[in-house]
Structure formats: structure tokens, C-alpha cells
Design a protein with these regions (language model features):
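Structured mid-to-C-terminal alpha-helical surface segments
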Residues: 1-45, 56-64, 68, 72-237
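Glycine-rich beta-strand-to-loop/alpha-helix junction loops that act as flexible
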Residues: 47-52
Length: 237
């Protein structure tokens, strides 16, 4: 998709081991600009998840990702939002494969790398259609892409870092993915974060899910994961 020379130029901002990953990172970065350059998208969804943390809070991302996690800000039909997302991405990424589950809609865009060996890659856009609230509000953060292949910028609607980490804590408790622990460790040791607000956001999201978790229960849950090789084996993806 992207000329090799432009992929090489992108290495200064995307320090990944393979050209295919650099190419995919450029595609993901352009997708963010295209999405939030569309008012119909920017006004209706907020950016969340590990990609949001690494792309908007770190000068150099600490983890490779192929996912764009969005949250529908207000309750309402999801159809117009999906149409706006596709209007931003389909013209240059093609038609996505769409899946719908409980509380979420996923669109997967597939493409092949230009760099050899040619590899199939994907960008996954997932919209949470359930969490229609923000504990600490939504802020706008600038995001810039400056590449010979594509240049652009957008103000991206995103949760505050404490709320992003609070939802990461929820993810760490509810699933077995080492990247959740890695993201929390990196952010808490590298950024200025109010720990109490992180815990408060975690509790608020659990309440929204109808759950209550004690510290002892959380520690037992985490200790069980730390004994699992699959949890520890791939913490960065």
C-alpha cells in the first residue's frame, strides 16, 4: 500500500522490527486523522484503549498495535456512525468485514503490504456501544501525521489518562491479555497520573457492569494470571 521509501522514512516515528509493522502503523495513524477529520465521527465517538494511550500520551509508542477502539459517546442508533466511519476509511482501505456482538460493533479492514515479503495486514476498528458515559469527561488532544505518504492532523476526542487506565484495570481483571498489565506499568511509571482517580474510575466502570471487586479478589485474579504462560508470553501485542 505504501511505497518502500516512505515506509523507511516512517521508521523514525515507528520503531518496530519489521517494515510490515511500520507500514501498518502508518495506515493506522492515517486512519485516526481521517476519522477525526470527519465531524460526524468526531462528535459521536471517543478514542480509548491501549492504542489511544500509546499514540496520544507517549512521544514514541511503547507498544505495537493494530486496533482502534472507539466508544459511542451518547445512546442512539449506531448505523449513522458506521456510515461516517466507512465514508472516512473505505475510499482508500476498501470495504471492511463487519461483526456485531453484545455491546460492540467491529469492522476489520484488510490490505497487503507493499514491502516484501508481501504480507496480509489489517486494521480493526471496534466501537463500544454500551459505555455511554465518561467519569472525568472527554478532552481533545492533537494528533499529527507527517509522512511523505500522508500528512494531516486532527483533534481527537479521548478520555483522560486516569480514565483510560481505569478501563485498563477493568480489562486486566476481566480478560487474560498481558498487554493490559504492560500498558498500566508503562503509563504509571512514565506519566503523571493520579492513582486515586484511576482506582475510582475502575470502580465506576465495574459498577456500570454490575460488579464489585475487593482488593483481595483483584490480587487473587492477577496472581492467577501471572502463573499463566500465555499471559506472560506476549505482553506487547
Amino acid at each position: 500500500m505504501i511505497p518502500r521509501a516512505h515506509v523507511t522514512a516512517g521508521r523514525s516515528r515507528a520503531p518496530w522490527p519489521t517494515d510490515a509493522q511500520v507500514e501498518q502503523d502508518l495506515v493506522l495513524s492515517r486512519a485516526l486523522v481521517e476519522l477525526y477529520g470527519n465531524a460526524s465521527v468526531a462528535q459521536t465517538v471517543a478514542f480509548r484503549g491501549g492504542t489511544a494511550i500509546h499514540k496520544l500520551f507517549f512521544t514514541t509508542p511503547g507498544r505495537y498495535s493494530e486496533d482502534i477502539d472507539l466508544v459511542q459517546i451518547g445512546a442512539g442508533p449506531i448505523g449513522p456512525i458506521l456510515d461516517a466511519i466507512r465514508a472516512s476509511l473505505d475510499p482508500w482501505l476498501g470495504e471492511p468485514k463487519r461483526k456485531q456482538g453484545q455491546g460492540r460493533v467491529t469492522m476489520i479492514y484488510r490490505f497487503e503490504t507493499t514491502t516484501r515479503p508481501i504480507q496480509p495486514m489489517r486494521i480493526k476498528v471496534e466501537i463500544n456501544t454500551r459505555d455511554h458515559f465518561a467519569v472525568l469527561g472527554i478532552q481533545r488532544r492533537p494528533f499529527i501525521v507527517d509522512s511523505p505518504w500522508f500528512s494531516g492532523h486532527a483533534d481527537i476526542g479521548i478520555y483522560r489518562i486516569e480514565e483510560l487506565l481505569g478501563t485498563k484495570l477493568r480489562a486486566l481483571y476481566q480478560r487474560k491479555k498481558g498487554r493490559d498489565l504492560y500498558d498500566l506499568w508503562l503509563a504509571l511509571t512514565s506519566l503523571e497520573v493520579d492513582d486515586e482517580k484511576v482506582v475510582d474510575c475502575f470502580r465506576r466502570y465495574l459498577e456500570h457492569d454490575g460488579l464489585a471487586v475487593s482488593r483481595a479478589e483483584f490480587e487473587e485474579n492477577l496472581n492467577g494470571k501471572l502463573r499463566n504462560r500465555s499471559f506472560l508470553g506476549r505482553p506487547y501485542y
